[in-house]
Amino acid sequence: FSLWDPFRAWNPLMTLIDTDLVNHMINSFLDIYDASGELPIWPLSAGETGTMIGYHSVSVIADAYLKGIRSFDAEKALEAMMISSDKNKKGSDFYVKYGFIPSNIKRESVSCLLEYAYDDWCIARMAQEMGKEDIYKKYIERSQNYINVFDGATRFFRGKRMDGNWESPFNPLAVGRAYTEATAWQYRFFVPHDVNGMIQLFGGKEEFVAALDDIFNTDAEIHGNLVDITGLIGQYVHGNEPSHHIAYLYNYVGEPWKTQKMSRRLLNEMYHPTPEGIIGNEDCGQMSAWYILSSMGLYSVCPGSNEYVLTTPLFEKVVVHLANGRTLTILANDPQKNIYITKVELNGKQIDTNFITYDCLMGGGELRFTLSDKPNKSRGTAEQTAPYSYTRDKVVSIPYVDKDLNLFQGSVVV
């Protein structure tokens, strides 16, 4: 299993078309847990490599469970999820103790923290669904640790040293060190479970939209070389997974037409019906799954939320044979010419939100997109049309004190 890549789109695609496979995968995860004491991260040839970051098995399990795909032992799965989250790997001991990973002690500290925070939200969601409030509270608090590495001055997630100071000098264009196969630009927007909280850290919707525009429009060049960084538009990198959700974030700030325009550009420029027609490598299905979902007019920004964010379909007609035996037909009028959504209807009922739920899709029927060659700047602009986000109120950093740290002269009284 490659869990760092396909949890983003491939696994959410399978929950639509092959729930048996999803159950089989999760039961295999639990077999691995029985044998090794931990859920898989990135196993190869029956051995765990620990190559990538996060513990994204929990995303696959929680996403399935919350969608009603449950042919596995949920109690055992939750136990495995918690144990795996507390295993000491790539700075997770610091993450649990302090709420951040010291960048002067561990490499990839920012990327690890951001992905751990999302994974902890997945555990919290599943625990809440199972009625385990204490577990929910523990992990939902941990899921907010992303706040602790956001620098309001630069508006980037940055490496923080053990003494609490930012890693300096800071170059958001530099490859590596605090980031996994990326720069600070590509991890600038990775809080899929709490986009609204992230927006508030940026200063509000206007500032967040400006930052989204910047990643696609900047002419700044990456400093350093990494083979995984391919398919650039500005500092957006389609050839590697951390960027894959970014184009869809305009749906959270009332400018969905920008998602529609950019997702179409990515579909047209990053995929070609030729040998080596995919930018980057296939990454165990993720690159293709992004294309499939996006060409259907859907994307799973936050697996575990039970929502798919909307964009313009690529084809006039797509027929999806759902796992429950029903059929979903997606229709769009002249999508090669018309790239903007004016109206969305499911079985004749208008959908005014910028997302659609899993249950609605699995009901089957006809999902019709009415399109135009001009952006509709009135649809999907209201706050209530935005997709799921955990935070609805203002957020603050989580403080910590360690008696072993000597940061002050004299004495410290707590």
Locate each region found by the language model.
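Active-site-surrounding "flap" and adjacent substrate/cofactor-binding loops of secreted or lumenal enzymes
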Residues: 19-44, 220-223
